[in-house]
Amino acid sequence: MGFCSTSTLPQTSLSNSQSSTFFTYLKPCPILSSTYLRPKRLKFRLRISATATIDSPNGAVAVVEPEKQPEKISFGRQYFPLAAVIGQDAIKTALLLGAIDREIGGIAICGKRGTAKTLMARGLHAILPPIEVVVGSMANADPNCPDEWEDGLADRAEYGSDGNIKTQIVKSPFVQIPLGVTEDRLIGSVDVEESVKSGTTVFQPGLLAEAHRGVLYVDEINLLDEGISNLLLNVLTEGVNIVEREGISFRHPCKPLLIATYNPEEGAVREHLLDRIAINLSADLPMSFDDRVAAVDIATRFQECSNEVFKMVDEETDSAKTQIILAREYLKDVTISRDQLKYLVMEAIRGGCQGHRAELYAARVAKCLAAIDGREKVGVDELKKAVELVILPRSTIVENPPDQQNQQPPPPPPPPQNQDSSEEQNEEEEKEEEDQEDEKDRENEQQQPQVPDEFIFDAEGGLVDEKLLFFAQQAQRRKGKAGRAKKVIFSEDRGRYIKPMLPKGPVKRLAVDATLRAAAPYQKLRRAKDIQKTRKVYVEKTDMRAKRMARKAGALVIFVVDASGSMALNRMQNAKGAALKLLAESYTSRDQVCIIPFRGDAAEVLLPPSRSISMARNRLERLPCGGGSPLAHGLTTAVRVGMNAEKSGDVGRIMIVAITDGRANISLKRSTDPEAEASDAPRPSSQELKDEILEVAGKIYKTGMSLLVIDTENKFVSTGFAKEIARVAQGKYYYLPNASDAVISAATKDALSALKES
């Protein structure tokens, strides 16, 4: 638990209605963990009274209205205070860093249900200081940064009698992005009502404009539409939202603090999205028994009497608010040396981090940590903490740390020298004492090393500190993958409405909202042309907009089963059992199952793609077996069925499960051409049959389908050809000569889960 410094703030006073007095802080700050604040170098004056005013060095004065105490609010929802959260120190520290520097790069919190992810995000908003905005700004424009104002604000800004721009103090915005948000609501669109009234195109700001200089919260970002998430991060990376659509050309700043949360059990987040967020932390770290009891106790007390909990952490909350204000001023003067940058780069290299974002974000985090501590230079502790918060979750690490029994602990830092005896003289003036303390702090900072004695990662990329292993493993488990499989199917007739688009033919589903927005600016002109005034709204064909719909893409599992030979009946029974198990669990995932046995001279579709269990039972009641082994035709038939299903628009992922021993004796030509058997052409050799099958396997990979080969060949006569098929198709291979339906189902579900996460 950290404490704020007891040093007095110079040139800082608290003024009541009659008197002013200097103040000190000695309050526990559980939110800040082990950080300390030294506000004595502060270069601006903070005066707190009935209404607080902050006098900045440039002479601007912002009037801050006092916030209402929670106990005085008689309506509305009260959110759990951040200071009352038990544990989760790393996440709370990261949130405070984001409060100090909104452009730090964002914070992602991963965790299962009930780990206080949303609670902490909303708790941070309660301690954010208010902001000063230009009156009439739709994007919370900062009066001190006219270069970042939205288009047209300079012309419509209001000025007071003293010639200064009128400003107002508002609460820091907190905007949550719903999962079903459309592109229009996110980035902004045409204001239909105002456009109809004025006869010109009027821009209506979206959620991104509302969130500028505040908090932008995305719950379950892993479930957010892929196009929306890409658009969101692109705008946040650029820091400006540029809208070019429907006759609109508008731009406004967008620099909020991004806080994203998600549950990995409901789906992984794409790796490139996590890479663009600075701090990625897990809320699933284990809690001690006492901490869990304390968490239940404080939550129960909050439900019974929230005012009591607010009063209990009132001092800590006030200290955190002051900490944020002071650290924002310190951050302007914090510097980081070249040697310290080299240390961060080396840690990123040893951790196997891709790109340069890891060290860039880590340097910014280290400076924020130094600002919290009241330092003008980044120290050793700040570097270590930055590596833990930024680089460690991005690393590719060795699962087992090296043996540390023979490792010696790092030497302690040298003790401060040349202690000045003037500290014991209590009769000296306060200004001289502060000057001497500043001088002594500068000497200590010069004596302390600039970089840590040890790296967190060793030269091979393994963790040196085994205490961080669990934390790193949690970060690795939640990473997503990039692949070619489609998770969403777009169409114009079925699914969820995500955005309007210009029609490419007849309009199947009219986007009424977008159509009215496109027609709104021309209503006055069209009404003037209509002499009879027969309509209230004039819409022409060029205004028409179609809906772009999206729906969840299901998967198709095609079982290609070798129904030839003495073990054919067992293989067919196991494939039938595995198919029924998958269908029983595919209701929510929209997965389909198909069974194609191959025997005799050709393969046949015994069960076409279906989600119906009753249909599968009826179709699989009779299981044909015996005869030759046309493996090539079985795989070719599976590809044809998969491509037809993909064209239907219901399937986004296709996986072929081949249950075979890899021994084929029927060529593809014989299977497709009945007259080939009657001809005098020589039978193909065993090598020619293998080459033909490998060629089909290569085509499976080129079509984007996934192949899982379950080898049932006896190991004593095994040729290993089934494994070669999987290698050429770049699929998965399992050797299961006596596989049951449960084993086949488990292997299929494992491969299917990996395909869905890709």
Curated annotation (Swiss-Prot):
Residues 408-417 have a biased composition (Pro residues). It catalyses: protoporphyrin IX + Mg(2+) + ATP + H2O = Mg-protoporphyrin IX + ADP + phosphate + 3 H(+). One of its GO terms (biological process) is photosynthesis. It is found in: Plastid, Chloroplast. It is an enzyme of class 6 (ligase). The keyword Plastid applies. PROSITE patterns: VWFA (PS50234). Pathway: Porphyrin-containing compound metabolism; chlorophyll biosynthesis. Residues 395-453, 669-688 are annotated as: Disordered. Residues 421-438 have a biased composition (Acidic residues). Disulfide bonds: none annotated. Involved in chlorophyll biosynthesis. Catalyzes the insertion of magnesium ion into protoporphyrin IX to yield Mg-protoporphyrin IX. The magnesium-chelatase is a complex of three subunits, CHLI, CHLD and CHLH. The reaction takes place in two steps, with an ATP-dependent activation followed by an ATP-dependent chelation step. The magnesium chelatase complex is a heterotrimer consisting of subunits CHLI, CHLD and CHLH. Belongs to the Mg-chelatase subunits D/I family. This is Magnesium-chelatase subunit ChlD, chloroplastic. The gene is CHLD.
